[in-house]
């Protein structure tokens, strides 16, 4: 791996080390971005400034003070610092950097002042800039000063060599650097100053100079490991051996501690000179960064997923169909391949089969190939195809872990993300500088997908299981989870975001500098713990940003309490680029417009901002990095929204509405236990009809309030995997599929208010009632202002107790639901906490089957939409498609029983439930999925679907 850090040359290095704080503060408060002559002590540079790459991109992550202590010990995220060694008579004792610094008077003073200056990137071990990992701390301390003029940029590189101490010649005198030459093969010549001091006989001065003298490579021993590896250059400086800091004085003793034949890691330092105004080198290997990010998000599961990936046969190839017949170069059709491993070698060797299928089937059928399946080494493998012009993108994964429907959606998301990041697939795969970035992208992608599969196979129940089960569906939907909020909170958020988008601040206004602004904000979207709170972006831009955040686990990361997250990169939103190429909008778009994505996260909030350069703003040239004024304004916006933290948490922790039931409550034994509770006086009071029948006008008004309140469900933070091709995952389960269409007038389903009992919240027969004053409370439409929701404590004091539920009758039979609004690009479903409150032993299996079936039903709906939008089919042909109409409905019937049934005398109780999905075609396609008990009547099913009434249908 390569580490980069920009520092300046300054004399008197010895004095710098003794002065401690003075030298460190000088290096902290300055950077190679600006000349020190113009640097002002009162104008500190941002802590992320030295993380910006040459192409202007930035990925900077800093943990919060609490999370770094919890997460870092659980994962290999923290870069391994260079250790120090203290020799005794019999052994060498390794001292960590923290232990070595104990007792230094300058360290506490430095840390205290560093926190005051907010320069935590040099003192906090939890700071991790993901585009440039920090160097070992002891190495950084050697170069902490700054001076105007020449800038020295030190690049750190790790090289692994195999050494064998047993092959050393016996009886050879132990001269200085003998082991360095004999074992490693590096020749180092001492400086003239050290030789002069040795001749003068000053032992103390000689030892002090030896401790400071660097091990510069001056030559090599022929045939040695150093010359065979070809990665060590003359002029490099050896700074560490197996993460132990070395210098002239201790190198021989460190090498003598090598017990036998082994692989040794050598860390080299290479100086690079550049001008004082040059930007920092971007160049760090991001593989460590991506691994660090994955370890931060998933903890110990990260190591397990890496081991599984090494054994799993999977491959990503980008092939060209246009071959040069004049050259006989092997593998000339392969433009990109990941991974390069033995497991993927077999898939790589049959790439000719994939090319033939892609070309032949398109010539025969006239349509491009989408997917294929084959048996390879007694294992079923799915292959997904994506063809553009004369290039073909192939993704192959084992069918046991990735259902085919999931693979198709994953491929579409990958293509959309790469186009959002690089404009075209050719630009992404054909440019050499993007190869390492693509490796990291696909590494994180497969780790994330494999983790979902492993979590769904673990027996148990919890937020991780629900997150994994639901991600199979929600990660394949072109949308993001929505969280409905009370009117006052939503209006306050929208007002703050509108003020930011107006850019009417002093430094951002055109009148301040009498020049054009650098950027214009197209829109923003605000997330909290992965939930979308507010969106001011066009729908296509929102989906692009959401998929990008999903691919890099940013939504999951925001669920943790992060200290600071800053991401900046140029993006290519297809929605705006298509408008630029359209003749209808050509006069409205300035040529040369460029788009940039700025993501800033603080604690649980994450604000994504899409900016445009060009047009009415200044034209961007080169690769501009993030402007600190814009970053500071976004930070200030998030700090302003922090006061809403408690209100949003209360919203997430509130009781489910509409009420959900646990599947275990409907088992025969459980239903008997709940019989007395069902017939209680409280529920009888709830079922009592109103004394005075309302007028038709009041009926419509009353239903509008109830329906809109029922509609606005909180979005679920769920993400999961599985496969909905089969619905028989649990023990003793059988599935039956029922497909039917609904006529046009079925769209006008019964719009009646449903008030009654049931919906007890909890498990094992214990429940709590939602107490809602219907006259004072109704939930708002997620996309418009509505009535203000009251707190649970206030509702408990109301005189009238009503339980809002979607099904009629004495019992609430609704288990789960999901509503996908394609027009807005959002979906709504129960939250993690709402599902966790239900518990149960059968209910987790129900949740898993629900999302597996919804994925299959969603695929059927997409086929219907593709047929409708196909140019070859007109409206008459669309109506002839089986089951196609203004509303399309598919359902799956499950029968389940407890998996661990110990009573051999009695057969396990069974319970049947439906998973039904509906597609509304007009005015915009919308999808609604519900799961309910088999005992519900047809009218109750219609009432369940009024969950979508609050949305525009």
Swiss-Prot record:
GO biological process: cilium assembly; establishment of planar polarity; limb development; nervous system development; regulation of smoothened signaling pathway; vesicle-mediated transport
Record's keyword terms, sorted: Cell projection, Cilium biogenesis/degradation, Cytoplasm, Cytoskeleton, Developmental protein
Coiled-coil positions: none
Feature: compositional bias, Gly residues: 756-767
Family in the record: Belongs to the inturned family.
Subunit architecture: Interacts with fuz and wdpcp; fuz, intu and wdpcp probably form the core CPLANE (ciliogenesis and planar polarity effectors) complex.
Identification of the protein by name: Protein inturned
